[in-house]
């Protein structure tokens, strides 16, 4: 483990740096000169094409972060393995901000992967060992992603609660009312017709029955040829 050139006081501050001053002071990977290609030609390139201090580890798609300690030749600080390249890049920024604030980097400007890391990452302004820096970096990155998840959840909840329901237009309401009338009218009309036909049927039945009782029976029976038979037909003939 590399030693610390200048031992700082035990006082530490977890508040992020000022956004205005940090943005003017620190460079980012987007404004700094591009990274030089790796000198190794027989091995697969694992470094991230943009982010500093970040390289891929294995085929699982995970990323690791390791930074050079400014002012200490050949001294590197291992910061761990992360699920995303952004997590490793934020760890690099937190480490550089902590080392620079503690005087390990000479107090000058440092190159960051993200400009907003200067005020979004809560890093200590002093430390005693590089182990303290590693521990502070892990806490700063974890706190950053926790706050991001909370903000995203709050935004999703507020957007869903403020979304107004689509009002129904006059045409839709009129169409719904018309459909309701059409669906209810056949049943009522059918019941009305059945009642009317029932009353009319009974009236016709009683009228025809009374008319039949008033009619006289025929006076004589008719034969097969249509002539009337005047003689009575006996019931028995011997």
Swiss-Prot record:
Claim: Protein transport is one of the keywords in the record: no
UniProt biased composition (Acidic residues): 170-182
The family database entries (Pfam families) matched by this protein are listed as: AP2
PROSITE patterns named among the record's database cross-references:
AP2_ERF
Which locations, inside or outside the cell, does it occupy? Nucleus
Residues in the DNA-binding region are 50-115
GO cellular component terms, semicolon-separated: nucleus
InterPro entries assigned to the protein according to its UniProt record, in alphabetical order: AP2/ERF_dom, AP2/ERF_dom_sf, DNA-bd_dom_sf, DRE1A-I
The protein's superkingdom reads: Eukaryota
- Feature: compositional bias, Low complexity: 9-22, 155-167
Return the annotated region ranges for Disordered: 1-41, 155-188
Does this UniProt record's set of keywords contain DNA-binding?
Answer: yes
- Signal sequence residues: none
Keyword annotations for this protein, in alphabetical order, are: Activator, DNA-binding, Nucleus, Stress response, Transcription, Transcription regulation
Molecular functions per Gene Ontology: DNA binding; DNA-binding transcription factor activity
Q: What is its main location?
A: nucleus
Annotated function = Transcriptional activator that binds specifically to the DNA sequence 5'-[AG]CCGAC-3'. Binding to the C-repeat/DRE element mediates high salinity- and dehydration-inducible transcription. Confers resistance to high salt, cold and drought stress.
Family statement drawn from the similarity comment of this UniProt entry: Belongs to the AP2/ERF transcription factor family. ERF subfamily.
**Record's PANTHER family?**
DEHYDRATION-RESPONSIVE ELEMENT-BINDING PROTEIN 1A, DEHYDRATION-RESPONSIVE ELEMENT-BINDING PROTEIN 1D
What protein am I looking at?
Dehydration-responsive element-binding protein 1A
The species this protein was found in: Oryza sativa subsp. indica (Rice)
